[in-house]
Amino acid sequence: MKKLSLILGFTSLFAIGHASLSPAITTDTAHWYMEHSYDVLQYKLAVDLYANYATPFPKTFSAVENITFRVDSSLNSIKLNAIGTSLGIDVVGLSAVSFTHANDTLTLQLDQTYNPGDEVEVEIHYHHLDVADQGLYVSNGFVFTDFPPEGARKVFPCWDRPSDKATWDLTAKVPVSVRLGSNGLLADSTIVGDTLWYHWVCDEQIATYLITWSSSNIWNIHVSYWNNIYSPDDSIPIWLYKKATENVTTAVEKIPLLTDFYASKFGPYPFTKIGFATVTSFPWGGMENQTMVNLRPNGYTDEPLIAHEHSHMWFGDMITCGTWADIWLNEGFATYCAQLWLEHQNGYEVYKNKMNALANSYLSGNPGWPIYQPEWAIQTPSANDLYNVAISYNKGACVLFQLRYVLGDSLFFEVMNSYATDTNFTYKCAVTEDFISVTNAVTGEDYSWFFDEWIYSPNHPYYENVWEMEDLGGGQFKVILNMNQTQTNTVFFKMPIEVEVDFNDGTDTIVTGWNDTNPQILEWIFNKYPSNVIFDPNRNILLKHGTTVVGEREKDPSGFFLYQNTPNPFREITTITYATDIDQYIVITLLNQSGKTLQTLVDRPFNRGVYRFSLSGENLSPGVYLCRMDAAGKSRTIKLVKR
């Protein structure tokens, strides 16, 4: 009877009465965000894929979609995303009485005006056109979908934004040889002759870009279980879709251990299934479809990839970025979680080396924009920009590393756990300000300054630090660190710092301080002779340039210093830094190579401190110049090169 009822149910989806209009279809793509005055509760799709697994492997299919939504404000029509070059709308039914399809927007006219709180169901009969659209992939017996960031609209009409989650129900008709997986749990599968119907149900809320089906007529399925550490009587199935020749040993061994580890840090595994599949012609390394991760071919041997994608079940799937401006809450978190797994398995040094590599990758590939781009909350960027590895992945992960350094391990992991288990966000969405609020609530302090620097501002600090030593007599020595951030295209970065002081007896020590003004002098007194100073010896500030202290300068009775300009050589502008340890009058002049004064740059009294100014090269011809600092009857000179 179950078999019969499923067949009749599937047939009825394709046979309901409906209204029909001739749609106006255009190839234009809508880049604006549509009016949205409803909340989608469920997408229910019945799709006929039977013909897609054999030559010539067509990309066409027919489908019936039922969408249930709750009204937020009175309406008599709704708009959905539906790409006109991919989808042809045939007829609509239930509460939808007519439609227009233009500019990649499907507008459904409803049978009446509905009021806030009303639940409405519409039905859409449509077909997918025989086009390659980077949403549906069909080749050599593989049929799968891949939707990030907004590709679901190429396969089924939807409101295709990450902030509106819904449940998912899929019934798929395929040849009996096909293995097909989707989000959630397999509710039923029925074979009649050479035809197989799969019925997948995802009761947890899911964003449209995380919806998928993956299938192949050459797959085997390896099923194992994770013993739920939070509910030992409930085991979670692990479904691995694979070619017969693929080795899944690493995945079978590591996925339960990964789940244990992430659950211990971030709370219970949030779903009822763990699923992975390897697919051909895949455009990414992996895609974190909710409970049904797609991997590149042979991805089962790639432990870091599996660790990254599996952590998305907490960060990205259970808690989804509320806007694309918050994508780092998905990708930065998953990138960092994979390194936490590395630390758990192999120790801190291995983890730190990998974090250094991520930081170096960012520093060499930084495109110059901040992690949080406000316009991305309104206008979807290109996939290349949104998924920029340097920013969304590597810098995002490094920011979490630095937050751990600032907070300390105990508070940091409390923040992460509190965020991951907060019912305001679980199975919903979160934005960057939500994570900041959790950080502030857990710590009892306001860390907005940290996120203002590292998330909302572009780039990173450039340090030009100089240390000096003063013999105080009586076996006492003062180390003076003149700190100077020279970046000109972003903010000042306030951070706690560590400084290693090496002594001439072969010993060393680490001292700490706060770099909270620019420029700044920090001092420490020791009872043995300092021989060297190293700024940030453990590279806790991953995201920076100029980590090497410029040099050692012993105290001079005149008590003033002129440091080499940066950059040098220069074209448009260069920064000149100077310092005085006593209150005195200072004159700085620019000269040509013959010693003729061209310009007086500084001429006034100064209090003790470190100072800097910018010198424009606009009116300087290319060549070599001298910059001289005069005070207390003595002078210091540096050489400047103008390109």
Can you name each region flagged by the protein language model?
Residues 331-398, 402, 406, 423-426:
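Acidic/His/Gly-enriched intrinsically disordered linker/tail segments
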Residues 18-63, 70, 448-449, 453:
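N-terminal, polar/Ser/Thr-rich
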Residues 163, 294-356:
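Zinc-dependent metallopeptidase catalytic helix centered on the HExxH motif
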Residues 63, 159-307:
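Hydrophobic helix-coil surface modules that form long, contiguous segments used
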Residues 28-37, 116, 125-169, 224, ...:
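Glycine/proline-rich low-complexity spacer/linker segments in large multi-domain proteins
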Residues 389-481:
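Amphipathic alpha-helical substructures
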Residues 556-566, 570-643:
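C-terminal outer-membrane/trafficking sorting elements
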Residues 83-140, 523-526:
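A surface-exposed beta-strand-loop module
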